[in-house]
Amino acid sequence: MHTSMTGRLLSLLLLTLATLSLAAQSPPRAPTFQVDPTWPTIPNDWVLGEVSSISVDSRDHIWVLHRPRSIPEAQRAKAAPPVLEFDTSGKLLASWGGAGDGYDWPEREHGIFADAKNFVWISGNGGWPKPAGPGSGDDMILKFTPQGKLVLQIGRRGQSTGNADTVNVHQPADAFVHAETNELYVADGYGNQRVAVFDADSGKFKRAWGAFGNTPPAAMAPNPPTPQPNQGGPDGPPQFGLVHAVKVSRDGVVYVADRTNNRIQTFTTAGKFLRQARLAQQGTVVPVPAGFAFSADAKQQFLYVVDSGPMQVAIFDRETMTQIGTIGVRGPKPGDFDIVHHMAADSKGNLYTAEIVTNRRAQKFVLSSSR
């Protein structure tokens, strides 16, 4: 009897260990979302152009950047200001932006980021696509108060000399301020091929790097860059194609979207290469990583990645960088996407997306399950 009991206990222990091992190996269940078709409310009979970017500040105010000059001429008199601030219910709180004294407003609005101090950063990619070089392009990043007062401009329009330039950027796609170090990370990707880092207060250049932590090429890249996902072996070419997004996680990992090479590369904040991941390909549609957001839990378990190829948001388990789910399909309906471009998340885990070209809208996706 004693032997029989021992055997049963041993079997139970082995079964438990096997179950725990299987659970540890299984990917986490992807969170699910429901679109809020009423968000946001656009007042004053305003018209939006291409909505190029979106961000959420420390108060859960949502900042939307759009391109008024992309609106058809017949509707342009009703164009909303380029910068719109909403609350989570979709109510407009403020609006501003455009050309002004003392700064170079972008020729083509591209990225917006609201930092932990609620300063609002604007980037542009005016001058693209055409041959890159001195005298062309939005070669600056702008920092504003939430009320639209200029605080800082890094760089000047048409002044970039390329990847080695420590004063100007060149048609930057995106920016992110790492609150812990007060450093501004720039996806300097339409005219250059680098991540550039500046002091967020003074604008002083600190460092830059290319793909795999390599030194970026001295010569300016073709504009637009040629997709090269199969060059350089299975990991792709040794330099970035188009650096379209950059984010830093709470644990200090820098995420970079290399749009034309379908790869997500991660680095330390000093620029040391860590790992690479790719979006899963579906059929013949080439994946296009274009933007990031993190889940709201303390460990930021999930990484959300804009995939402008099949027009969806991919969900990654951040620990393994395994793709475990997707949000959305291509189409015009609420919850669908057509040229989804950038994204953001609020403190409750809800997601916000920006669409250019056809749909020209911002959308909100409410977190309905987290695991």
Report residues per predicted region.
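N-terminal secretory signal peptides that target proteins for export/translocation
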Residues: 1-7
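Eukaryotic scaffold repeat domains enriched in small/polar residues
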Residues: 24-371
